[in-house]
Curated annotation (Swiss-Prot):
The lineage of its organism: Eukaryota, Cryptophyceae, Pyrenomonadales, Geminigeraceae, Guillardia. It comes from Guillardia theta. The gene is ycf29. It is found in: Plastid, Chloroplast. Residues 146-208 form the HTH luxR-type domain. Disulfide bonds: none annotated. This is Probable transcriptional regulator ycf29. Pfam families: GerE.
Length: 208
């Protein structure tokens, strides 16, 4: 097994209808430093996932392929099967399995596949986390930029800005501030130029 995986406990769900095979497989996975949760059927898989938060799922039940609904399971899933014909392989992929192994399988190959799928899953999570961080950073930079531009407004311009956000017209602002409507229009023009906006609607959502 990969050195990094050996350092940690990998949590695995095993769907195995036959009790003695489940025991043998769980013993094998235990030797590989895996924590194995065994279920005899697919029915309660969602509950098991929510309870144990596993890293990967292995299903040894090729007799009931059509019963598996995998579209809502965002975990790597491996099928152990005796079905090796082309049509069977196509069906396996269409159902959403990430990988499959023909029985009897090579234990080392199975561990290699598990290791590879787990790393892919983690890399995807890391990429999603990075994208989320970048998105948040862009929002912060945008807010800082808008805040900096707002700071450059004069006292009078900030007053007009606030009144526009409150929904007042130019005429209403001129009455409140005791200045001409023409003066208000000049302030509005300056605000548009400094904040690089084009209309009053953009002022209403400026800090959002």
């Amino acid at each position: 097994m990969d050195k990094e995986l050996k350092k940690e406990k990998i949590k695995l769900i095993l769907i195995e209808p036959e009790e003695h095979l489940g025991y043998l497989l769980s013993e094998f996975f235990y030797q590989q430093n895996f924590v194995t949760y065994i279920s005899e059927s697919f029915i309660h898989l969602t509950d098991i996932i929510n309870l144990h938060n596993p890293d990967i799922i292995i299903i040894d039940d090729s007799q009931n392929l059509e019963t598996y609904k995998l579209s809502n399971i965002y975990l790597p899933i491996i099928l152990l099967t005796t079905r090796g014909l082309k049509n069977d392989r196509m069906k396996i992929h269409k159902l959403g399995f990430d990988a499959y192994m023909l029985k009897p399988f090579d234990p080392d190959e199975l561990i290699a596949i598990i290791s590879n799928l787990i790393y892919k899953k983690r890399n995807i999570k890391e990429l999603q986390f990075i994208k989320h961080r970048i998105s948040n950073l862009n929002l912060k930079l945008k807010y800082r930029e808008t805040s900096f531009s707002y700071i450059n407004l004069t006292v009078k311009e900030k007053e007009v800005f606030k009144f526009i956000q409150d929904g007042l017209t130019n005429k209403q602002i001129s009455n409140v501030m005791g200045i001409t409507q023409r003066s208000v229009e000049k302030y509005v023009t300056k605000i548009f130029e400094k904040l690089k906006i084009q209309n009053r609607i953009q002022i209403l959502s400026y800090f959002n």
